[in-house]
Amino acid sequence: MTTDATQTWIITGASKGFGRALAEAALAAGDNVVVAVRNPDGMADLAAEYSDTCLVARFDARDTHAAAGLVSATLDRFGRLDVLVNNAGRAVIGAVEEVSDAQLRDLMDLHLFGPAALVRAALPAMRGRRSGTIVQMSSQGGRVAFPGVSAYCASKFALEGWSESLAAEVAPFGVRVLLVEPSRFRTAFNAGLEFSAVSDSYRDTLAPLRADMAGADGVQEGDPVRAAGIIVRLAHSEHVPLRLPLGSEAVERLSGVYRRGLAEVERWAEIARSADFDDAVSAVRPV
């Protein structure tokens, strides 16, 4: 799907960081953008600069009941929906024993259930046109988990698994799915981290992580403007990858994860295969 034609985007969490950079890049490219944010007042400058092509919508990405209304507003204003970006996100820092059930569920609402509802609302329009791109802003933490960020990684792992199934289901309708897996980028993400209550058991073991996460704000390697430009170009291109590690750290770290994972499978393959019935016939599956 190579196209220079005007596309219409929905971008959640577009008030800052990746979302803001994406909105600015898409608008600068001549596209229409619906910026879905909790505080529309903060988007007045963008709405004024792009009054014909930018629609600001009040939206909480965790509110699954609001998804259909956001898509309807987009179609009413621009007549089509080409690109959906589930970008809204945040993180909770703390050991498994320190993070509460409420904190874990809130991240699942934000990173899985909210995006799932918005995708379901958007798909009829995309399927109807047999065209569309769904961009899921994941993380390198959606492929490799780190101590102290279990809740965040769990929610991103869930998003990735759900999205991989989605990609196979919607491909026959001309709809693509792109999972973006950034490393650290110079956004306000780290400034907005939520830290769980610190227990004596993990105070020392996770102290370096907490300090690193808190101290990284403003010195991250990744440039969100460059990243946004890449995503906009991909949305207009013929081919997109299912997964795009974004940033040098993500490329290096995830390459190592895949190499070590394959080596581990091969190391234990003989034992693993011995669990089958001796006379079992290998299954033939549709996928």
Where are these regions (language model features)?
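Conserved glycine-rich cofactor-binding loop
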Residues: 15-16
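Conserved glycine-rich Rossmann-like NAD(P)H-binding loop of the short-chain dehydrogenase/reductase
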Residues: 29-45
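The beta1-alpha1 cofactor-binding region of Rossmann-like NAD(H)/NADP(H)-dependent oxidoreductases
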Residues: 59-69, 101
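Substrate-binding pocket helix/loop in short-chain dehydrogenase/reductase
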Residues: 95-96, 103-105
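Active-site helix of classical SDR
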Residues: 119, 155
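Residue(s) in the substrate-gating loop at a strand-loop-helix junction
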Residues: 139
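SDR active-site lid
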Residues: 172-241
